[in-house]
Amino acid sequence: MGFLVFHVFQVLKIRRFLEQMKETDIVKAIMKYLRTVPGCFCWKEHGGMYGTAGIPDIIACIDGRFFGFEVKTDIGKPTKLQEATIRKILAAGGTALVVRSVDEVRTAITDSLH
């Protein structure tokens, strides 16, 4: 029984690692795209012990408009804190959402600025 629990834990750990790798790739692709957008200032928010919990992964200001992009894989879900932060950004007049691709970011920017 102990081995089975250990094995399941290892499988879940590996799955999370692979998901993180993919999320990292999505973040890199989005950052690469945002650097081509005229009038865009953006940065990757670093989590961990020195970051602020719940802040979207990517912050951008485009032509004076605030954007917060919480990046997730196809199976990833935002935490309750991330959802609350997105609601606060929206209430303050910014744009914030969960994105899973560069195309979703492109659409959000286009919809917001036009």
Feature annotation, model-predicted:
Residues 2-114:
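Catalytic phosphate/metal-binding cores of nucleic-acid and nucleotide-processing enzymes, i.e., regions
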